[in-house]
A protein has these predicted regions:
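Alpha-helix capping and helix-loop boundary segments enriched in small/acidic/polar residues
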Residues: 265-266, 309, 374, 418-425, ...
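Bacterial N-terminal signal peptides
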Residues: 1-10
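Outer-membrane beta-barrel transmembrane domain signature of Gram-negative proteins
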Residues: 218-241, 406-473, 512, 598-646, ...
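Extended, well-ordered alpha-helical scaffold/bundle regions in very large, multi-domain proteins
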Residues: 287, 293, 301-302, 311-312, ...
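Sec/Tat signal peptide C-region and signal peptidase I cleavage site
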Residues: 11-15
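Extended, hydrophobic alpha-helical segments in both membrane/secreted and soluble proteins
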Residues: 249, 272-278, 286, 292, ...
Length: 862
């Protein structure tokens, strides 16, 4: 009886253990990459006409890549509507022919968009890992409407659609199928000169009618990485990297109008520019890319904002030269390309440097000179990139750019005499990168950035090393980074020496990277003297940080949703020198997509204990003064409807609530975002973005004090100004309207209008004393301010030949900053003022023409 009971009890326990083991084994298998498929390339001798017909004999002889596997929304499921891809090659190019079967013509979504803009459409994608390092690759995408997209893939840059190549393609719709024919010339990619080669390869298909994505070689979402989940392309023999040499000259003309309406000043002006981009394949691995006398006047206008923080605003890079092929230079986060050709070094402090003061009889102080013009950008003379990767996986990058002197013009208010003041000396910017790819999706990298300026103005140098080591199963990874910064010379515009103390930064992270459950722990230090900001961007140094996080991701559909992603983490930050507490808090997030209507929903919850903000007071050295930020909690939610519908929208709501801080209560803030979009046809679409935010009883730095202001003088003792904080209400409203009409897959027109207004109203003030103590004071200066920015960007683009483009751009711009009694508190008052103040208008035409040596050279006769 006892033995029977023992077996009876042991049976279920053993079954549960076996079930748990089976479940764990299944999870372990799902977290491993799928077995690699192989595709044999077929060499051809006959010419292939890129017309979308696939009627040449070579297509019938080539092996077929088919039986695609779904990645989302249901990973691992075989495709229902077959995809058939064939690959041919000759001495000059790869040829890809693909047939995508579907249920009906109406199921093939084919919105027309601009190049590199994926709309509401199907697509076929071709991925190449030409060095088979499982880290770096190329992507070429084609939609049924013939729109091309291309991208580079790397650990530093992720998926980068800023990269552009010149390749050919055509598509056709036949009954329930659509066909794609693609030619990728060897000049568009880089590979070794080995006699026989094995490349990583994969094909992707997006079926937009069902929001399904498929890959030929299965890509598991729970496995970290994309390139490492490619199949293999074999049979490439005796292909040689061609001479890659191209020249893209440009000419441009600008007409500008601003209503100065002043005697001696013209309201309109014209200018003509010319230059060229040169690309030269130094060998099979490395390419030189240079821009000579570049013209970036047609790039999209920046989204200007009112900045009340102690840190600069980081703007997007819209200049093509600095976004294409820069993945190596972005290693380590030490390169902020807006520094090159950006705002002059002495732009902000010009008034202080030239201040020659005289005293009037009424005791008011006036300035002896005033600024007539102060250019906000630096003229770039040229820029050059050399980059590539050897067959052994060593990536090498070299960047260099030269900018010219920049001068402001000032005028004496008494004599009327003008003079020029240097705001930026002739400067050289350079970056050097080494990046060694290792097995198991790992790498080791070294990067150096340097800024050298003419004359005695200081030079800056930063050197960094970083690594990532993953285990053989690609489940765990250790990564780290160490940087060292150095400055030598004089502060610009003075004889004062730059503080010669060098600085450093390091970080270390251990993480589980594959599977449903993942986690990470990291630690980092930035010394008080670490400063990479001459060619990089760092908002604040002098910190010690620790963080730990756990995430759970469900990749398969369950209940009523397609997937689920969750994350929760804890963090702590300290001031590095002197060691002081800054912040302790938590964060969490989730997002999911519903199965039936493909509505995406997400949210975030975070909170922190009382923070000590050492940067808001703008007082050096750090550590003595700080602004207390009460314990707070923040919550936001966002949603997106199904983009397949003609009408779709995005919506977001966010709020933050603060605990009472002594007598100060009622501090909170909220944000609202709404973005409806309407696709009238496959060629015409509209989008509206509305964002509104308000901060109540926010405590912040009220501004610097000046002995020229009567209200400031009681708070300046012996030349040392107090730190004045203000309790303020800040309201920000942004409206953006855009429309796009695509004539063909090579011709489009877009227009974007943005109006931004932010108003800060101060209610009372306090003096900040050491140790975070605030003392109420009777400060009488009106510190209210408002900022308006209005921009219109209208662009007509026509790719009239491969790599060749005509663009016609109209820009309308206006920005105004009002302070004190001039501040406009109401939105519509600001809007009317923006419309009624002078605007700058610019119309420009730019023509690029792509010249490729391989197409221009005389062809050998048979």
């Amino acid at each position: 009886m006892g033995l029977f009971l023992l077996l009876l009890l042991a049976g279920p326990a053993h079954a549960q253990k076996s079930a748990a083991s089976a479940k764990a084994a299944a999870a372990d298998s799902a977290a491993r990459p799928a077995a690699k498929r192989q595709l044999q390339a077929t060499r051809i001798s006959e010419a292939i006409k890129i017309d979308g017909d696939l009627d040449e004999a070579g297509w019938r002889e080539a092996p077929v890549a088919t039986n695609f596997v779904e990645t989302r929304p249901t990973p691992g499921r075989p495709e229902k509507h077959a995809t058939e891809v064939r690959l041919l090659y000759d001495d000059a190019a790869l040829y890809i022919g693909a047939v995508m079967h579907d249920v009906s013509p109406d199921s093939i979504f084919r919105e027309l968009t601009q190049r590199d803009d994926l709309g509401n459409t199907d697509y076929i994608g071709v991925f190449l890992d030409t060095y088979h390092d499982k880290l770096n690759g190329y992507g070429f995408f084609l939609t049924p409407g013939g729109v091309q997209l291309d991208a580079r893939y790397s650990p530093a840059g992720g998926e980068d659609f800023n990269w552009n190549a010149v390749w050919e393609s055509r598509t056709q719709l036949r009954g329930n199928d659509w066909i794609a024919e693609i030619r990728i010339p060897y000049s568009a990619i880089r590979f070794s000169d080995a006699a026989e080669q094995v490349w990583g390869i994969n094909f992707a298909r997006q079926r937009q009618s069902t929001r399904q994505q498929f890959f030929w070689n299965e890509v598991k979402p729970q496995v970290d990485g994309l390139i490492n989940q490619f199949g293999e392309l074999r049979g490439l023999r005796d292909i040689k990297p061609p001479l890659r040499l191209s020249l893209t000259p440009y000419v441009s003309t600008y007409f500008n109008h601003f209503p100065y309406n002043e005697q001696g000043k013209r309201n309109s002006s014209t200018s003509f520019n010319g230059g060229a981009d040169v690309k030269w394949g130094i060998n099979e691995s490395f390419t030189l890319d240079a821009t000579l006398v570049p013209d970036f006047g047609q790039v999209q206008s920046d989204n200007q904002v009112l900045n009340l923080s102690p840190f600069e605003v980081q703007y997007n890079e819209n200049r093509a030269f600095f976004t294409e092929g820069t993945e190596l230079f972005n290693k380590g986060g030490l390169f902020y390309s807006r520094r090159v050709g950006g705002q002059p070094l002495g732009f902000d402090d010009l008034d202080g440097r030239l201040r020659k003061r005289t005293t009037d009889s009424d005791g008011q102080i006036r300035q002896g000179e005033y600024v007539v013009s102060n250019p906000g950008i630096t003229r770039l003379l040229n820029a050059t990139k050399i980059s590539g990767r050897t067959k052994n996986g060593l990536g090498v990058g070299l960047f260099n750019a030269l900018s010219n002197d920049v001068y402001a013009t000032v005028q004496d208010s008494t004599t009327g005499q003008r003079r020029e003041v240097l705001t930026q000396p002739f400067s050289n910017y350079s970056i050097f990168v080494l990046d060694q790819s290792l097995k198991n999706n790992s790498y080791v990298s070294l990067i150096n950035t340097n800024v050298t300026r003419q004359g005695s103005t200081y030079d800056a140098n930063v050197t960094g090393g970083l690594f990532r080591f993953a285990d053989k199963s690609n489940r765990y990874a250790l990564k780290g980074q160490a940087n060292y910064s150095r400055r030598r010379g004089q502060v610009f515009g003075s004889t004062e020496q730059v503080d010669n103390r060098d600085g450093y930064k390091y970080s270390l992270e251990l993480a589980k990277i594959s599977g449903n459950w993942n986690w990470s722990v990291n630690h980092g230090i930035e010394s008080d003297t670490y400063d990479p900001n001459d060619l990089g961007i760092l908002f604040s140094n002098n910190s010690i940080s620790q963080e730990a996080s756990v995430s759970y991701n469900k990749y398969e559909p369950f209940w009523k949703v397609n997937n689920l992603r969750t994350n929760i983490g804890l963090y702590q930050t300290l001031l590095y020198k002197p060691t002081r507490r800054q912040d302790v808090g938590f964060y969490s997030s989730f997002n999911t997509t519903f199965t039936k209507n493909f509505f995406s929903l997400g949210g975030n919850l975070d909170g922190s204990l009382v923070q000590h903000d050492y940067f808001e007071p703008r007082r050096q050295p750090l550590g003595e003064y700080y602004v207390r930020v009460p314990a707070n909690i923040g919550l936001n939610g966002y949603g997106s409807s199904d983009y397949r519908k003609k009408f779709a929208y995005d919506i977001s709501l966010a709020g933050r609530w603060y605990a009472a801080d002594g007598a100060r209560t009622g501090r909170n803030g909220y944000d609202v975002g709404l973005s409806p979009r309407y696709r009238a046809t496959n060629q015409l679409s509209f989008r509206y973005n509305f964002n509104f935010s308000q901060r109540h009883n926010e405590i912040g730095y009220a501004g610097s004090l000046s002995d020229q202001q009567v209200a400031d003088r009681p708070f300046i003792q012996n030349g040392v100004a107090d730190v004045i904080l203000g309790r303020r209400r800040r309201t920000t409203t942004t409206n953006t309207v855009s429309a796009s009409y695509t004539f063909t897959n090579r011709m489009s027109f877009t227009v974007r209008t943005r109006h931004y207004v932010s108003v800060a109203h101060y209610r009372d003030f306090s003096r900040l004393n050491p140790g975070g103590e605030e003392e109420t004071v009777d400060y009488r200066r009106n510190r209210d301010n408002s900022f308006n920015a209005f921009n219109v960007d209208a662009v007509f683009s026509w790719w009239f030949a491969p790599g060749s483009q005509i663009t016609v751009v109209w820009k309308n711009a206006n920005a105004s900053y009002l302070a004190g009694d001039e501040t406009l508190p109401q939105y519509f008052t600001n809007f009317n003022n923006t419309l009624n103040t002078p605007h700058n208008n610019s119309v420009s035409v730019k023509v690029l023409y792509y010249l490729d040596y391989l197409t221009l050279r005389p062809k050998k006769r048979g």
